[in-house]
């Protein structure tokens, strides 16, 4: 994985003289730093500059490579002395309530990845056709962590008609940073505290 953990490990190993190859399934190194965190929080040129420094140090990046499809873990082990698995967690937690499979309900990372790819100049079908573009829409984000804050603040920047954040606890008990919540409120996000959805309609 060429995300934060994989790149940090590769850098430390390279410093003490190891030859390091990073395999990653995506077309760019950076993982969550490139595709998950919005540009207004982390400009992508910073990640790209860091990646270039790692390449200059001798670290090899192999992109668009899927373990299990392009090569098995066993095949990789035959060609390397050690393997670090730093694949990250991209699987969304599902809300198991009636209607969770309805149209226009998306996991946070799908929305953020589409937005970040668009910002990088990629063609993104589900953004270009309006599916994952919040422009003119009434957006509801469920959750209170930093990823939820990234979603509401990205929706504001995409010119959503309205943006609400539903969270099951009160403001004092949100897991996200207080600064992020404050920024979202300043940007016009409406928070609905002590709210937990029972069904989607």
Task: Specify the residue positions occupied by each region the protein language model found.
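Hydrophobic or amphipathic alpha-helical targeting/insertion segments
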Residues: 13, 20-23, 79-86
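A Rossmann-like FAD-binding core segment of flavoenzymes
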Residues: 45-94, 100, 110, 116-129, ...
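Conserved Rossmann-like nucleotide-cofactor binding loop
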Residues: 5, 28, 90, 147, ...
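Active-site-proximal loop->helix
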Residues: 30-37, 177-183
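Cofactor-binding loop segments of dinucleotide-utilizing enzymes, especially the Rossmann-like FAD-
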Residues: 2, 25, 144, 167-170, ...
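Residues that mark the start of a beta-strand
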Residues: 19, 137-138
């Amino acid at each position: 994985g060429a995300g934060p953990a994989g790149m940090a490990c590769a850098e430390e190993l390279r410093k003490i003289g190891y030859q390091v190859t990073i395999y990653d399934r995506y077309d760019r190194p950076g993982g969550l730093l490139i595709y998950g965190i919005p540009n207004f929080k982390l400009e992508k040129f910073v990640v790209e500059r860091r990646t270039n420094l790692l390449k200059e140090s001798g670290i090899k990046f192999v992109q668009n490579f899927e373990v299990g499809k392009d090569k098995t873990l066993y095949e990789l082990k035959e060609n390397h002395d050690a393997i670090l698995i730093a694949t990250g967690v991209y699987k969304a937690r599902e809300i198991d309530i009636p209607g969770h499979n309805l149209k226009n309900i998306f996991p946070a990372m799908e929305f953020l990845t589409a937005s970040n790819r668009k910002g990088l100049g990629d063609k993104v079908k589900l953004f270009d056709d309006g599916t994952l573009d919040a422009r003119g829409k009434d957006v509801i984000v469920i959750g209170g962590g930093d990823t939820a804050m990234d979603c509401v603040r990205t929706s504001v920047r995409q010119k959503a008609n309205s943006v609400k954040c539903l969270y099951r606890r009160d403001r004092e008990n949100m897991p996200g940073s207080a600064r992020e919540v404050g920024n979202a409120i300043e940007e016009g996000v409406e928070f609905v505290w002590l709210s937990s959805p029972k069904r989607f309609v």
